[in-house]
């Protein structure tokens, strides 16, 4: 158990923590700072804070996980999805903050890249994996949902939705990191209890995020950027699928879902009503800020909610 759990957490934490003092000054020299939205006056002081810190997270996960690939082959597709979406995020960040192309990847380019990575994962799951695409139904007493070929469109929706959910969640210091630590811990506990064969990478993600949080907690000295947030989305959804638990994302990843829905609702309502808004700002974490909540309070509440939801999900196994 030490080999499977403790070592990945410690090693990935150490790598992430040690990379901080090296990577952050390097990013500052490259002037890869983030530009904050003018509507949030409290965020204007963050202008220029280095982004692309997700490289620290990715490096920690990759370095730790490669030592477990031989004994735990099921971590390979999860590592592929994590790195694959991390690369998409890196390209987006690079275009925005290094090449100063404000839009980064165009919407269709980003979606195409996400579909390509998802397709590789879908082909693996459908043709090469011994993990079926049936889904454990929460609170069903161990019953599984078999959609047949319908599982593939659901997989695409789950991947795209989760990845964009983690992306929208990354809007406050430590928010995406803290929420995903809870989610990764949940998957780690389940993986260990069910001998799912993926515990080393789920534990590595916990350690990597704890190490990154040393520099990302308020006031953050680095942001993960799309490099980190998209990678985390890829991790969450692929880990869930490798344990036949994508339906549990709706529970443990409810914050991701709410963040996405708040944006969809806001944009749709804005267009339908000619400029009216339901929320003061979307994603919804900014709405709470404009309601007077401090940034740290929003992060704490969202993290506590996620922790409670993880306990609820565990009861539903």
Where are these predicted regions, by residue range?
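Short aromatic-rich membrane-water interface segments that cap or initiate transmembrane helices
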Residues: 47-49, 138-150
């Amino acid at each position: 158990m030490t080999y499977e759990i403790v070592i990945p957490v410690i090693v990935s934490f150490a790598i992430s923590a040690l990379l901080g003092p090296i990577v952050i000054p390097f990013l500052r020299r490259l002037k890869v700072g983030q530009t904050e939205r003018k509507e949030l006056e409290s965020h204007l002081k963050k202008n220029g804070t280095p982004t692309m810190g997700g490289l620290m997270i990715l490096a920690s996960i990759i370095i730790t996980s490669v030592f477990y690939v031989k004994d735990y082959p099921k971590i390979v597709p999860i590592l592929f999805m994590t790195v694959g979406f991390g690369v998409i995020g890196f390209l987006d960040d690079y275009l925005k903050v290094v090449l100063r192309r404000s839009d980064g990847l165009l919407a269709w380019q980003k979606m195409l890249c996400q579909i390509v990575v998802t397709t590789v994962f879908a082909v693996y799951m459908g043709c090469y994996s011994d993990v079926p695409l049936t889904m454990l139904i929460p609170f069903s007493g161990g019953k599984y949902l078999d959609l047949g070929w319908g599982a593939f469109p659901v997989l695409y929706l789950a991947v795209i939705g989760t990845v964009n959910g983690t992306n929208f969640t990354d809007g406050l210091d430590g928010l995406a990191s803290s929420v995903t630590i809870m989610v990764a811990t949940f998957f780690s506990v389940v993986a260990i209890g069910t001998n799912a064969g993926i515990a080393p990478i789920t534990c590595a993600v916990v350690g990597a995020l704890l190490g990154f949080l040393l520099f990302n907690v308020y006031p953050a000295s680095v942001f993960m950027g799309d490099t980190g947030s998209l990678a985390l989305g890829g991790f969450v959804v692929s880990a869930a699928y490798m344990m036949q638990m994508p339906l549990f994302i709706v529970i443990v990843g409810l914050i991701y879902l709410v963040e996405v829905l708040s944006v969809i609702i806001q944009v749709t309502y804005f267009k339908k009503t000619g400029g009216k808004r339901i929320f003061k700002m979307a994603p919804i974490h900014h709405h709470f800020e404009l309601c007077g909540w401090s940034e740290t309070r929003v992060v704490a509440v969202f993290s506590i909610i996620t922790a409670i939801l993880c306990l609820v999900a565990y009861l539903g196994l």
